Design a protein with these regions (language model features):
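Short histidine/acidic/glycine/proline-rich micro-motifs that form metal-
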Residues: 1, 91, 178-182
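Post-DEXD/H (motif II) to motif III coupling segment of the RecA-like Helicase ATP-binding lobe
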Residues: 1-32
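Amphipathic alpha-helical transducer elements in NTP-driven molecular machines
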Residues: 4-7, 66-70, 140, 152-156
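Hydrophobic packing residues within well-ordered alpha-helices of enzyme cores
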Residues: 10, 96-100, 137, 158
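Short, conserved beta-strand edge motifs with alternating hydrophobic and charged residues
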Residues: 31-36, 84-88, 108-111, 128-129
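Conserved interdomain hinge at the start of the Helicase C-terminal
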Residues: 44-88, 94-99
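Alpha-helix capping/helix-boundary segments
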Residues: 89-92, 132-134
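Conserved RecA-like P-loop NTPase helicase motor core
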Residues: 105-107, 111-186
Length: 186
């Protein structure tokens, strides 16, 4: 099933799945980068469960955490990697790009952008995108590094973005892990 809810539409036009092959020819190196940063503020909902959207919002606003992510981006950039940075929030994409600075080839890939702007961003060495827009249907075979800048439980589609590579670098996934107990397993 597709996360975007279009499974029924595709099945209607194309019919049932005949065969499902999991492609295991390329396996990325996966690293967890532990920030040691706890969210400043947590809230619970009426039912007593943790308010995850608020928590993710607080993490994305953390200046110290964002500087740490940008430090990783700069390190991988210096290794001649083509980097996709995924996050849950549009504002986070914009803040990270601003912190990275103009000395680096970077672009934004978020919803509501015109096609020409998206295509231009897709040519950059660092692409900041939301999970939503880059999850299904996004293709850039030159990518070799994925940085998961905000917590996400299902990243299979996201990791697939760097497994279609056309360059010499091995695929690399860097998961930014925060020490808050709920987020460690995401």
């Amino acid at each position: 099933t597709r996360a975007d809810g279009l499974t029924k539409v595709i099945k209607y036009f194309m019919g049932d799945v005949i065969v499902n092959i999991k492609q295991n020819s390329i396996c990325p190196n996966i690293y967890n980068h532990y920030t040691g940063i706890d969210p400043i503020e947590t809230k619970t909902m009426i039912n007593g469960k943790l308010n995850m959207p608020h928590l993710i919002g607080e993490l994305c606003k953390s200046f110290e955490r964002n500087l740490e992510i940008v430090k990783i981006i700069k390190e991988k950039y210096s290794q001649n990697r083509k980097i996709l940075v995924l996050t849950d929030r549009r504002e986070h994409c914009l803040n990270l790009q601003r912190l990275l600075g103009d000395d680096y080839s970077s672009g934004i890939y978020i919803g509501s952008m015109k096609n020409t702007a998206l295509q231009e961003s897709n040519t950059k060495r660092v692409i900041f995108a939301t999970y939503y827009i880059a999850s299904e249907g996004y293709d850039n075979p030159k990518l070799d590094t994925l940085i998961l800048a905000s917590p996400k439980s299902n990243v299979e589609q996201a990791v697939g973005r760097i497994l279609r590579q056309e360059n010499e670098n091995e695929p690399l996934v860097i998961d930014i892990v925060d020490s808050f107990s709920v987020l460690i397993n995401m």
